């Protein structure tokens, strides 16, 4: 229900939010009396529950100065269709205009918005968002994030009370929760040097979206002792063959039972006509049969007493209503018998600890490591593993989960499992959509491990017919971006960046600060690195005298030691090994340096492809990244050598700095929380 403005302001005042109080008038005489009581000049506004935006219908009249003018304006406002009365309030001294709002998001629930008013919010979309409830840090960050923050800080002798704005945002927690508010526009709010006043308020109360969820233990789904492959095949290349082959190739530690009524053996494993014919207990089923048969197969799985299933088959809801009906039937059986399901339409699960893999795409033996992946695509247990193993030799995985259509197991459940998994140090997520966003946020915001997220579909806003400014400005991607900031998730925008950043977290320690030393073999690279550091939120470290003295020992007299270090003259005079080793050790020892980026030219002819003393680098407890440039074959060999010894390698200095910037920002927020 839409509250009238005087009702909205009375509600806000109840929670200590200062407003320009208004008097609701239904007659001309009431309006005249109210104006005299308030004192001229006054503001007069049309009031009506079916009038969405007063200004759109000419329903706001400022600077009304006399009794006669009150009478004329009252008649004009009451002639507006759906008018129920007129609100009269004092004409406020103009301050810095801001907008504060709340809207309901389908995935995440109540979202708070802040921005500067006027052109800043309407045209420039200079706004920030956070999920409710807000912490003080959330509110402070919301205010600082907008480009117009400089106006509040102080500009041309005009200054706003930032503390009052933060306090107003924090009061939203209680008022929204207690009063069941689904939409709120406080627009404008005038911010003065001391205090802030809500000049106009629009509030809708109703039933807020609730998010009920539980987080069961998924361990049995990753550690089965026996698995039935239903739809196993003797034909190389068919999904049913590839699944069995992958299980054997990756050394699955449990028992494998191929199910095929027309085969005796597949890859030397005995076949069974159905899962019910297997004499032993079966923990998991991998189902690779046509979608229309899957409900029947699930019924047999339920009869067998399995704990979980991975449905790799496609042809479900992604193909239309008929497929959606198959999903409903499958889920009904699963719920009734307590079976958890990954998929359908997925490559499923990988656990490198026990060799459990459900992919229907032939896979290489996947390296064990500390990266966990949650993906709404089959790519990760498909072609992506070929790309990773050939281009990123350092990357190893603990668990990979392809979510598919997500009819049962959801992202937040897998995320919770990986956060508790001892083999997983960093989590990478690829998502296209999210069902229970609030559950995902709740789990993610409690994480003590870095979470790197690549979400596609950024331009598909999926807006409903928005009835408030806040709802219309609050696009899905804006909200998701706010979720990432609020939960300290590292957001990336491509698969390449996903691997670059997870690799950094996987291989190197977190920086203790934002001061970076950059070493490059060209002056141009030094300039590019400096610019990139600024935009990535990093500071170029100031070297101590001791550091400068050490580096000067391998520096020609005519060359200055600065940060970034242009190392090429040193290489020419003293050789690559001595120049790089001296410079790297010096900056790593410097207490004023938190991280190091070293760039080398890999060229066999001039032997500039420096390879460091790996053991000595680890003792400093600081991250060091390399970028390697040059001839492709030499770069590949040199990159492999570095990464297999725990040093991440990037294509150029800008790439390396951007990754370090994201890692540093994560580390800084983690320390502050």
Swiss-Prot record:
SMART domains: CoA_binding. Residues 9-45 form the ATP-grasp domain. It holds the Pfam family Succ_CoA_lig. Activity requires divalent metal cations. ATP binds at residues 35-46. Its EC number is 6.2.1.13. It comes from the Archaea. GO terms for molecular function: acetate-CoA ligase (ADP-forming) activity; ATP binding; metal ion binding. It catalyses: acetate + ATP + CoA = acetyl-CoA + ADP + phosphate. Keywords: ATP-binding, Ligase, Nucleotide-binding. Gene3D superfamilies: ATP-grasp fold, A domain (3.30.1490.20), ATP-grasp fold, B domain (3.30.470.20), NAD(P)-binding Rossmann-like Domain (3.40.50.720), Succinyl-CoA synthetase domains (3.40.50.261). In the N-terminal section; belongs to the acetate CoA ligase beta subunit family. In the C-terminal section; belongs to the acetate CoA ligase alpha subunit family. Homodimer. NCBIfam families: AcCoALig_Archglob. Catalyzes the reversible conversion of a variety of acids to the corresponding acyl-CoA esters. Shows the highest activity with the aryl acids, indoleacetate and phenylacetate, as compared to acetate. In the reverse direction, phenylacetyl-CoA is the best substrate. Seems to be involved primarily in the degradation of aryl-CoA esters to the corresponding acids. Participates in the degradation of branched-chain amino acids via branched-chain-acyl-CoA esters. This is Acetate--CoA ligase [ADP-forming] II.
């Amino acid at each position: 229900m839409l509250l009238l403005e005087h009702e909205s302001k009375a509600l806000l005042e109840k929670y200590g939010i200062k407003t320009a109080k208004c008097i609701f008038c239904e007659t001309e005489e009431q309006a005249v009396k109210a104006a005299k009581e308030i004192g001229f000049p006054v503001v007069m506004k049309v009031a009506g529950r079916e009038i969405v935006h007063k200004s759109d219908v000419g329903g706001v009249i400022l600077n009304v100065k006399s009794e006669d003018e009150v009478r004329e304006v009252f008649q004009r406002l009451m002639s507006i269709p759906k008018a129920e009365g007129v609100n009269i309030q004092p004409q406020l001294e103009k301050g810095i205009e801001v907008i504060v709002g709340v809207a309901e998001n389908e995935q995440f629930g109540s979202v708070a918005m802040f921005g500067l008013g006027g052109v800043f919010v309407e045209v420039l979309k200079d706004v920030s968002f956070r999920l409710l409830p807000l912490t003080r840090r959330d509110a402070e960050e919301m205010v600082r994030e907008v480009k117009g923050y400089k106006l509040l800080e102080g500009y041309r002798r005009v200054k706003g009370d930032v503390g009052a704005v933060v306090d107003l945002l924090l009061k939203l927690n209680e008022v929204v929760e207690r009063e069941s508010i689904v939409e709120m526009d406080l627009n404008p709010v005038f911010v003065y040097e001391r205090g802030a006043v809500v000049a106009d308020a629009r509030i809708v109360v109703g039933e807020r979206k609730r998010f009920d969820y539980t987080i069961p233990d998924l361990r049995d789904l990753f550690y089965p002792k026996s698995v039935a492959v239903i739809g196993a095949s003797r034909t190389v290349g068919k999904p049913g063959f590839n699944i069995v082959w992958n299980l054997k190739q990756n050394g699955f530690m449990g028992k494998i039972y191929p199910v095929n009524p027309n085969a005796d053996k597949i890859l030397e494993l005995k076949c069974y006509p159905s899962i019910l014919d297997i004499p032993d207990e079966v923990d998991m089923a991998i189902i690779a049969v046509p979608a229309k048969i899957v409900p029947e197969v699930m019924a047999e799985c339920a009869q067998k007493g399995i704990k979980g299933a991975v449905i790799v088959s496609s042809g479900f809801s992604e193909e239309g209503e008929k497929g959606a009906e198959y999903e409903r039937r499958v889920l009904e059986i699963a719920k009734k018998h307590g079976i958890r399901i990954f998929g359908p339409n997925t490559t499923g699960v990988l656990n490198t600890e026990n060799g459990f893999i459900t992919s229907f795409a032939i896979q290489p033996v996947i390296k064990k490591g500390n990266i966990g992946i949650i993906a709404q695509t089959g790519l990760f247990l498909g072609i992506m593993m070929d790309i990773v193993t050939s281009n990123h030799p350092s990357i190893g995985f603990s668990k990979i989960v392809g979510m598919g259509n997500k009819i049962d197991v959801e992202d937040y459940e897998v995320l919770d499992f990986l956060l508790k998994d001892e083999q997983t140090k960093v989590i990478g997520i690829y998502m296209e959509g999210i069902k229970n966003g609030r559950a995902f946020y709740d789990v993610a915001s409690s994480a003590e491990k870095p979470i790197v997220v690549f979400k596609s579909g950024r331009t598909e806003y999926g807006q409903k017919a928005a009835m408030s400014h806040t709802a219309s400005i609050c696009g899905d991607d804006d909200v998701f971006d706010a979720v990432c900031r609020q939960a300290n998730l590292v957001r990336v925008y491509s698969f390449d960046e996903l691997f670059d950043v997870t690799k950094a977290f996987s291989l190197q320690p977190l920086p203790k600060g934002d001061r970076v030393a950059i070493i490059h073999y060209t002056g141009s690279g030094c300039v590019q690195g400096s610019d990139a550091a600024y935009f990535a939120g990093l500071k170029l470290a100031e070297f101590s005298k001791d550091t400068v003295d050490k580096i000067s020992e391998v520096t020609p007299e005519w060359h200055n030691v600065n940060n970034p270090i242009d190392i090429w003259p040193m290489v020419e005079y003293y050789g690559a090994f001595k120049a790089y080793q001296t410079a790297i050790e010096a900056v790593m020892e410097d207490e004023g340096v938190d991280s190091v980026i070293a760039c080398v030219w890999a060229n066999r002819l001039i032997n500039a492809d420096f390879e460091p003393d790996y053991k000595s680098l680890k003792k400093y407890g600081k991250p060091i990244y390399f970028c390697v440039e040059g001839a492709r074959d030499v770069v590949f060999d040199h990159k492999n050598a570095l990464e297999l010894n725990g040093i991440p390698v990037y294509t150029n200095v800008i790439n390396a700095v951007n990754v370090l910037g994201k890692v540093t920002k994560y580390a800084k927020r983690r320390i502050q929380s």
